[in-house]
Regions:
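Beta-strand/loop substructures that line and gate deep hydrophobic ligand-binding cavities in soluble
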Residues: 86-139
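Hydrophobic/aromatic beta-strand elements that line small-molecule binding cavities or substrate pockets
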Residues: 5-7, 69-75, 97-104
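Short beta-strand-to-loop capping motifs
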Residues: 9-11, 63, 118-122
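Glycine-rich portal/gate segments that line the openings of hydrophobic small-molecule binding cavities
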Residues: 28, 38-90, 139-151
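Hydrophobic ligand-binding cavity/cleft-lining segments
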Residues: 1-50
Length: 154
């Protein structure tokens, strides 16, 4: 399966890029379900494995239900503002590879993009998996927007 989602973020591209590359800094911008974020188990911790700005580096996310998810950056280009990363396999998904990148748009703001490919173990899981990732990406984009709205508001 393949997905691509984009959203405009009201912030300069370099600032959004810095936020994205702070690989274990998700708790700064990730919205809780109560704040309008993703429904389901809460993100409890996000720790960095490796050095900040090193490639590879991994973020280990622990959810409220005890599930642990690792995402590892294996390519980062600060000039083109693009990363490639992989997510650890789970009981329903394998081979998740994604790219996140930032483009400047008119007015000094930016667009953030996420493209991914993955396999599902059971063909019946295709639509639910796509819907889940689309919800995750929408929550990420909204978290970025609110982070920069709070930051500029003081």
């Amino acid at each position: 399966m393949a997905l691509h989602k984009s959203a405009n973020i009201p912030a300069p591209p370099d600032e959004v890029w810095d936020l994205i590359c702070d690989w274990a800094g998700m708790l700064r911008w990730w919205l809780t379900a109560e704040e309008g974020g993703l429904q389901g188990p809460a993100l409890v911790t996000c720790e960095l494995i490796g050095e900040h700005d090193s490639v590879p580096r991994t973020r280990r996310m622990t959810l409220g239900n005890g599930i642990v998810v690792d995402e590892q950056i294996f390519y980062q280009n600060d000039e083109t503002q693009r990363i490639y990363y992989r997510k650890s396999d789970d009981q329903s998904l394998t081979g998740y590879i994604a790219s996140t990148y930032v483009d400047e748009i008119e007015g000094g703001d930016c667009a953030s993009h996420i493209s991914c490919m993955f396999d599902v173990r059971d063909p019946a899981d295709r639509a639910p998996a796509a819907a889940r990732f689309e919800a995750v990406y929408a929550a990420m984009f909204e978290g970025y927007r609110r982070y920069f709205t709070r930051t500029t508001a003081g």
